[in-house]
């Protein structure tokens, strides 16, 4: 009887290990805190799986996938980057879902004497350095450029821009007083409430929405974490970090 129980346990352990997965997730930098918490909860619920998180600007993540980086799930901070991923057949189009929405804001450090109220205020002489993520590869930079071009302020402000590789780098620059102001997402500003404050929210022509999808090479068990993103607990975590449901 004892030998039978041992054999049964070994067989069960074998099948658990056989179904275990190391799930590789590449996600926009602004999802860092929320996805880290969600992954921790997921691993508690699915101890057989290990979630590996990779955060960067959405364009940089896309390039990594093009270069052959192993990725199972891709979450970008804009629809344009996901469109490109689909065009290049890097993700499964039928798994694409928009799962959260964000806002664009201008921030200053909490000890700054600056108090800009609108985009025009950024043209004033006392604002000399503005952190802006690279519009060519980072969605927040692209959203910002579109807004400033529509307001006919891009060329005026361009000499003040200090280019960064991600929204989190822009956040750090302002928090450390390396720049006077910066364009980030509302959720990023909320992460460092003691170091930065929101000067004003920037209206965008289109809502800032985030899509997620399984990659074409995703492992069989990856859909477990993909589905987990949409459960009530995970959605509550995203909400707690300031994300809202898509309109």
How would you name each of these model-derived features?
Residues 13, 50-52:
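Exposed boundary/loop context
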């Amino acid at each position: 009887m004892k030998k039978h129980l041992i054999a049964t346990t070994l067989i069960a352990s074998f099948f658990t290990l056989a179904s275990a997965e190391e799930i590789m997730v590449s996600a926009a930098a602004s999802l860092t805190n929320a996805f880290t918490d969600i992954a921790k909860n997921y691993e508690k619920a699915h101890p057989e799986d290990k979630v590996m998180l990779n955060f960067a600007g959405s364009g940089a993540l896309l390039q990594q996938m093009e270069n052959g980086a192993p990725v199972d799930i891709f979450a970008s901070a804009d629809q344009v980057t996901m469109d490109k991923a689909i065009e290049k057949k890097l993700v499964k189009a039928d798994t694409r879902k928009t799962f959260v929405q964000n806002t664009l804001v201008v921030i200053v450090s909490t000890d700054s004497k600056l108090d800009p109220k609108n985009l025009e205020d950024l043209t004033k002489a006392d604002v000399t350095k503005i952190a802006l993520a690279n519009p060519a590869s980072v969605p927040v930079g692209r959203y910002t450029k579109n807004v400033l071009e529509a307001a006919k302020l891009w060329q005026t402000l361009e000499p003040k821009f200090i280019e960064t590789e991600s929204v989190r780098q822009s956040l750090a620059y302002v928090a450390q007083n390396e720049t006077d102001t910066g364009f980030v997402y509302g959720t990023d500003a909320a992460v460092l409430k003691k170091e930065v404050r929101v000067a004003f929210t920037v209206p965008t022509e289109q809502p800032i929405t985030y899509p997620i999808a399984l990659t074409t090479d995703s492992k069989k068990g990856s859909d477990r974490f993909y589905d987990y993103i949409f459960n009530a607990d995970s959605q509550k975590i995203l909400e707690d970090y300031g994300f809202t449901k898509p309109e």
